[in-house]
């Protein structure tokens, strides 16, 4: 599968990097590290990026450096500038509805309650279709405030599990690009 753009949804990195809601940016940083690349800041358009060759294709790795609810504007501008179709994107984000340690690909994504995903639809239009990689962070226990939960760091135990999950996701992204989505899903979705 050809992915020209892989985006890790994020709030401003300097303020929120280690939080649950910035799992997408964790993923991009881990992926850049795998390819021994350092992200470059585009100050004019508020995002970090780097180009990496995965298999036979170059993919642009991006972390928006703005608030989650406006990530879509940055992504839209990038796709317009580089002539990337929405179905050539993989959007990586946290997911409250998946337990910590679980991740899922979703192809031809069409809706979500995630603010970053809503922002993409707002910028691209409701008919936009793209691919996602959802990384589970679980829900807070005892009905704690969701926003507080998202904007706090995971426990040390959760962090270890999240990092293991991201490592597995990166291997599966390689399979997705180099082989096919069915093979990647079989590996990622296997318990």
From Swiss-Prot:
One of its GO terms (biological process) is rescue of stalled ribosome. Its main location: cytoplasm. TRNA binds at residues 16, 67, 69, 115. The active site is at residue 21. InterPro entries: Pept_tRNA_hydro, Pept_tRNA_hydro_sf. Keywords: Cytoplasm, Hydrolase, RNA-binding, tRNA-binding. It is an enzyme of class 3 (hydrolase). The keyword ATP-binding does not apply. The keyword Mitochondrion does not apply. Coiled coil: none annotated. CDD domains: PTH (cd00462). The record marks 94 as: Stabilizes the basic form of H active site to accept a proton. One of its GO terms (molecular function) is peptidyl-tRNA hydrolase activity. Pfam families: Pept_tRNA_hydro (PF01195). Its EC number is 3.1.1.29. It is found in: Cytoplasm. It catalyses: an N-acyl-L-alpha-aminoacyl-tRNA + H2O = an N-acyl-L-amino acid + a tRNA + H(+). The record marks 11 as: Discriminates between blocked and unblocked aminoacyl-tRNA. GO terms for cellular component: cytoplasm. Belongs to the PTH family. HAMAP family: Pept_tRNA_hydro_bact. Monomer. Hydrolyzes ribosome-free peptidyl-tRNAs (with 1 or more amino acids incorporated), which drop off the ribosome during protein synthesis, or as a result of ribosome stalling. Catalyzes the release of premature peptidyl moieties from peptidyl-tRNA molecules trapped in stalled 50S ribosomal subunits, and thus maintains levels of free tRNAs and 50S ribosomes. This is Peptidyl-tRNA hydrolase. The gene is pth.
